[in-house]
Amino acid sequence: MNEETQTSELTNTDQGPQIEPGPISKWLNQKGLIHKLLEPDEIGIENLGVDPQQLFKIVSELKMNGFNYLQCQGGYDEGPGLSLVCFYHLMEMKDFNEGDKPREVRLKVFLDRNGSLRVPSLYKLFRGCDWQERETYDMFGINFDGHPHPKRLLMPEDWRGWPLRKDYIQPDFYEMQDAY
């Protein structure tokens, strides 16, 4: 499989502007790891789309290649009827010389809101994602397979629905139970 074939398996069929693969995308291609090129952000950080089945393997490879810090994990809703997105911002943390910039990459897993909202937990790789994954579950309903504490973090355990989804309808009334 060549570089074009690997990245094109997850690309959209629209004919928008051609996105050039960055160094991290090229490295993943050399490793045979399939991903989708997304437009870099305004400061040039690579954004890559990843299948849920490939996420753990790709992040494991990145961690072994120096991306040893999960700066942020979260989720967002693209809108009613559109995808729910689980994202990861990985960085390389080391001793830098003056003027050096850390390597950074963002991975995004696009999930059909009416399909399986399951991604593998990265807790085994980055223990700091414990509460971040729980918050993403609590607010968007994305399940993290293999997470050691898969329960709500912010909302009461008996809360119905996912408050940060754009199609969420807030209940008129919710009775809080005493914690005593």
Swiss-Prot record:
Its EC number is 7.1.1.-. GO terms for molecular function: NADH dehydrogenase (ubiquinone) activity; quinone binding. One of its GO terms (biological process) is photosynthesis, light reaction. Residues 1-16 have a biased composition (Polar residues). It is a peripheral membrane protein. Pfam families: Complex1_30kDa. One of its GO terms (cellular component) is plasma membrane-derived thylakoid membrane. Keywords: Membrane, NAD, NADP, Plastoquinone, Quinone, Thylakoid, Translocase, Transport. It is an enzyme of class 7 (translocase). The keyword Transit peptide does not apply. Residues 1-23 are annotated as: Disordered. It is found in: Cellular thylakoid membrane. It comes from the Bacteria. Belongs to the complex I 30 kDa subunit family. NDH-1 shuttles electrons from an unknown electron donor, via FMN and iron-sulfur (Fe-S) centers, to quinones in the respiratory and/or the photosynthetic chain. The immediate electron acceptor for the enzyme in this species is believed to be plastoquinone. Couples the redox reaction to proton translocation, and thus conserves the redox energy in a proton gradient. Cyanobacterial NDH-1 also plays a role in inorganic carbon-concentration. NDH-1 can be composed of about 15 different subunits; different subcomplexes with different compositions have been identified which probably have different functions. This is NAD(P)H-quinone oxidoreductase subunit J. It comes from Prochlorococcus marinus (strain MIT 9211).
